[in-house]
């Protein structure tokens, strides 16, 4: 698993950035890449940090779209749009093979929630993985990654847990953050702009004989 937090700006070329942004939040249906011939659908979620686990979530509602699930594999044609992004991100880490465990996007609208009132600390799934977090647009609502690590026994934090800041990253179009999914993490709510991200959970298969070559 990766041993640091990596932030790369312009991980993909600007036309590719614009295509992703247009597809997810442009909404005019003018996409031209293969398998992208429909308007992008968003689905309401009652909490953007709730990964279908019971827990004391704060009710930060938003919209989501799943591309890949651990149970069913690829469930959205839009997944193909992000393969180049995944490939470029893995190249930065010199990872040659990955298994895509989970992939989704989230969209949240501006709120008046104070910046220090962050979303529920969480981790994405109960299995070793690393996180690829890509910012679709410029926004506020920083990503917060903590020093504390999970034992993969509960996907949500409780009131007795204490967290210390490891890294804070601001959303910027074309920026990607890569980190070990064992770290608890969360985000601030946006106050001034819509916040749109891609969140993929990947497993490094570089040292095994089977996997998806990228």
Placement of each model-derived feature along the sequence:
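Non-heme Fe(II)/2-oxoglutarate
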Residues: 1-97
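Catalytic core of non-heme Fe(II) oxygenases with the double-stranded beta-helix
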Residues: 79, 83, 87-214
